[in-house]
Amino acid sequence: MPGGLEKTCHQCISKIASNACFVVVLCAFLALPLSMTFIGMKFLEDCPIQPLIPLYLLVGGIVGTLKVSLLLYDSTRMRRLLSKAVVIDDDDDDEYPWRQNAHRYYIHLLLSLFLFLWFILGNYWVFSVYLPDFLPPFQQPQDYCDKTLYLFAVGVLALSHTVLVLLLLCSGCVYLCSRWRLAADED
């Protein structure tokens, strides 16, 4: 049974990844990590109360750009293969291509794991100084964070939380639908 679920998930992901709309969505998603990189570089020295906030944006933006670029490459590669009418038969050894390209699978896995851990660290760094002074105070000029930088970091985290919740909800729905389908097939 797990093999059937794995095959179904693979077919679903292949259909989504080969869709032209998916490529457009990935290109739109590329704007966020690029802007994170830009904001992180521009305001690198402008948050002395928590100097890791611009570093969070800079590193997260660079790694996020790499991750989305690899996804775009894989998606366009899959579209090219499908346009050449490369069909994966059920009896073919290439039924699960990520097993054939284990290095690419592990690169995606490591990048995703790093981004998730970086997201957790970013939450700590940003919210540990929640609503800092946006202008340097006269008595303690090191206790401030640039308003654009800080609010952008909070916005990135809010968007990340939203996407994470939506992914969890969609994953739960897919799991429930597959369980109902398996139960219906058994009856």
Curated annotation (Swiss-Prot):
Ranges that cross the membrane: 21-41, 52-72, 107-127, 149-169
Membrane topology, as annotated: Multi-pass membrane protein
GO cellular component annotations of the record: membrane
Keyword Transmembrane among UniProt keywords: yes
Entry keywords, A to Z: Membrane, Transmembrane, Transmembrane helix
Cited InterPro entries: TMEM272
Main location: membrane
Protein name as catalogued: Transmembrane protein 272
Organism of origin: Homo sapiens
